[in-house]
């Protein structure tokens, strides 16, 4: 039996449609076979209709789906909202699950068939608590930190509670604590600061920050053909 990781998909009113499209694309990338378990983390500003659309799309894509709703948060700082959703998810996971989880944001794109199994296998084949892209800040401090889209242990709230309470990006604030406990992987590619001509890494199975849907659209025909041939 292949090792499994929980897929955690957070979304707010601003990216609910993107989350729905991601679930549709995951089903296509998996050759129209339900795979894995998903936890939807719904922000308090999402209306019922959008929540239901994403839930239905997730139920098509995954073998099992759980849904939790975060209390509404009013703050102009985007980091605070992301930190809030992650805290709600991490606290719930610590109490309800025993498996590592992939924090999968709505602007992610699976790049290859079997992407989730490959991520799980690589994670369980390394000795550390976390795995994902490791980055370095560009300032003089050059802090090494784990990319937000990464695989986390189910009890990560123990290490992330304090960073999640700050105004900054929790993963950057937690860098000095988390980075030494993380294994760098090339399976997840981060393109948040790249242009649309970004070349997809041959080793990557998941890409983050396809905000315009450019890469997803490029891959759609390829996955459509593969799904028909299965």
Question: For the regions a protein language model found, what residue spans apply to each?
Answer:
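Catalytic core and acceptor-binding pocket of nucleotide-sugar-dependent glycosyltransferases
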Residues: 110-113, 125-230
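N-proximal low-complexity "stem/linker" segments adjacent to membrane-targeting elements
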Residues: 1-27
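Short, acidic, metal-binding catalytic loop of nucleotide-sugar glycosyltransferases
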Residues: 24-36, 61
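Active-site-proximal specificity loops/subdomain of glycosyltransferases
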Residues: 42-98
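Acidic donor-binding/catalytic loop of UDP-sugar-dependent glycosyltransferases
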Residues: 106-122
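Short beta-strand-to-loop acidic/aromatic patch adjacent to the donor-nucleotide binding site
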Residues: 97-109
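Phosphate/oxyanion-binding active-site loops and adjacent basic polyanion-contact surfaces
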Residues: 14-22, 75-86, 112
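Short acidic, S/G/P-rich loop/turn micro-motifs used as interaction or catalytic elements
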Residues: 11-18, 46-49, 107-111, 156-159
């Amino acid at each position: 039996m292949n090792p499994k990781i929980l897929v955690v998909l957070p979304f707010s009113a601003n990216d609910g449609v993107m989350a729905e499209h991601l679930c549709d694309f995951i089903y296509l990338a998996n050759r129209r076979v339900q795979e894995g378990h998903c936890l939807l983390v719904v922000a308090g500003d999402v209306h019922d209709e959008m929540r239901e659309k994403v839930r239905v799309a997730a139920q098509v894509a995954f073998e099992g789906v759980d849904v939790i709703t975060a209390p509404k948060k009013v703050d102009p700082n985007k980091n605070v909202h992301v930190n809030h959703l992650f805290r709600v998810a991490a606290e719930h996971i610590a109490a309800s699950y025993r498996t590592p989880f992939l924090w999968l944001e709505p602007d992610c794109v699976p790049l290859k068939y079997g992407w989730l199994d490959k991520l799980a296998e690589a994670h369980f084949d390394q000795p550390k608590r976390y795995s994902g892209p490791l980055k370095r800040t560009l300032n003089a401090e050059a802090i090494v930190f784990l990319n937000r889209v990464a695989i986390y242990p189910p009890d990560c709230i123990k290490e992330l509670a304090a960073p999640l309470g700050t105004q900054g990006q929790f993963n950057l604030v937690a860098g000095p604590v988390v980075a030494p406990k993380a294994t760098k992987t090339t399976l997840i590619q981060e393109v948040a600061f790249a242009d649309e001509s970004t070349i997809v890494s041959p080793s990557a199975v998941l890409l983050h920050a396809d905000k315009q849907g450019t890469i997803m659209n490029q891959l759609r025909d390829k996955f459509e053909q593969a799904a028909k041939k299965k």
